[in-house]
Regions:
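Alpha-helix-loop-beta-strand connector modules within alpha/beta enzyme cores
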Residues: 1-25, 56-84, 103-104, 130-139
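Active-site rim beta-loop-alpha module in soluble metabolic enzymes
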Residues: 24-65
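Catalytic cores of alpha/beta
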Residues: 26-37, 86-107
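Short, well-ordered coil↔helix boundary/capping segments
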Residues: 58-65, 90-94, 119
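C-terminal functional extensions of proteins
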Residues: 94-96, 109-116, 133-139
Length: 139
């Protein structure tokens, strides 16, 4: 589809008063989406790194703090009413989000995907299977 088309789609959705929550991977994308009227800009740090199928390479949490702040600053440089959320990469657990949110300004929260639906299920399934595997028969 291409990012230009995504920006245009956000612009059209905004004209129809639809809620828009596009990802921005860098400052230029944040500026473009803010200009298009995005309600929420998700500062995306890449594929989630935790879990059984998580990405093997990503930014560190410390690097994510800097990048999320840069994206937030870029978005707010265009429109100060845009909501900015952090997401992805090493920001997978509540404590990860807390780490980023406590060290950034004008970042309003966390946008969950794998961290809300995949990771908790992986944990629960793994624990349940381990419990079944631990069953021992009396001899």
């Amino acid at each position: 589809m291409g990012y230009d088309r995504e920006v245009e789609l956000v612009r059209l959705a905004r004209q129809k008063d639809l809620l828009t929550t596009p990802y921005a991977f860098n400052t230029e994308e944040a500026e473009r989406m803010a200009d298009a009227g995005a309600d929420v800009i998700v500062a995306h740090m890449g594929l989630t790194t935790k879990g059984t199928i998580g990405a093997e390479t990503a930014f560190t949490l410390e690097q994510s703090v800097v990048r999320v702040q840069e994206i937030a600053d870029a978005a707010h440089g265009v429109r100060n009413d845009v909501i900015v959320l952090c997401h992805g990469g090493p920001i997978a657990m509540p404590e990860d989000a807390q780490f980023v949110l406590r060290q950034t300004n004008n970042v309003h929260g966390f946008y969950g995907a794998s961290s809300m639906e995949r990771l908790p299920v992986e944990t629960a399934l793994t624990e349940q299977v381990q419990a079944f595997k631990a069953i021992r028969f009396d001899s």
